[in-house]
C-alpha cells in the first residue's frame, strides 16, 4: 500500500518537566514507527485557551478525582458542548450515558463496581483519551489507628475521621 506520512502536535504544560520528558519519550518511540510528533510546551494560560477552544491535536492533562468519582462531568454527552467544560474532547456515547446515569442512582458497592468496569471497558474500546500512567502513591497504616478505610481511588485521602485506639 501507499505510505501516508502522519504528523501531529502534542501540547504539554511548559512548566512541567514531567510532561516534557513524557512527551519526548513518546516522540522518540513514535519516530521509530515513522510517526512525527512535535512536542509543544505551552504556559498554562495559553494551554487552557487552546483546550477551551479545542484547538489541539493531542494534549497532556492530568485528571484527579475525589470520592465518589463523578463520571458525568467528564464523560456524559450532555457535557460535550459546554464552553470551558470538562468533557474536553466532546465525547458522546449513548451507552456511556446510560451507564453514568445508572451509576448516579446505584448505591450498592458491588453493583457500582460492575457498572464502573463496564464504563472503563467502553472507554478502552472508544479511546477518547489514551491513559499513559498513574503516579504511585505510598500509604501507611498502623494497627493503633482505628476506623481507617482506604478507598480504591486516591487511597491516601480518607474523608472519614480516624482515632488512636487505647
Q: Language-model features: where?
A:
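Short, well-ordered beta-strand elements
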Residues: 4-15, 37-40, 57, 158
Amino acid at each position: 500500500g501507499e505510505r501516508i506520512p502522519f504528523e501531529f502536535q502534542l501540547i504539554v504544560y511548559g512548566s512541567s518537566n514531567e510532561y516534557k520528558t513524557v512527551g519526548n519519550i513518546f516522540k522518540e518511540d513514535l519516530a521509530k514507527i515513522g510517526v512525527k510528533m512535535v512536542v509543544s510546551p505551552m504556559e498554562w494560560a495559553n494551554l487552557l485557551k487552546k483546550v477551551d477552544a479545542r484547538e489541539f491535536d493531542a494534549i497532556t492533562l492530568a485528571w484527579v478525582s475525589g470520592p465518589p468519582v463523578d463520571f458525568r462531568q467528564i464523560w456524559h454527552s450532555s457535557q460535550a458542548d459546554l464552553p470551558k467544560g470538562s468533557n474536553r474532547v466532546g465525547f458522546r456515547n449513548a451507552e456511556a450515558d446510560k451507564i453514568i446515569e445508572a451509576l448516579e442512582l446505584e448505591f450498592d458497592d458491588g453493583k457500582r463496581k460492575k457498572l464502573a468496569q463496564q464504563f472503563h471497558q467502553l472507554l478502552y474500546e472508544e479511546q477518547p483519551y489514551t491513559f499513559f500512567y498513574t503516579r504511585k502513591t505510598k500509604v501507611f497504616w498502623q494497627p493503633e489507628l482505628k476506623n481507617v478505610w482506604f478507598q480504591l481511588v486516591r487511597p491516601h485521602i480518607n474523608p472519614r475521621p480516624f482515632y488512636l485506639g487505647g
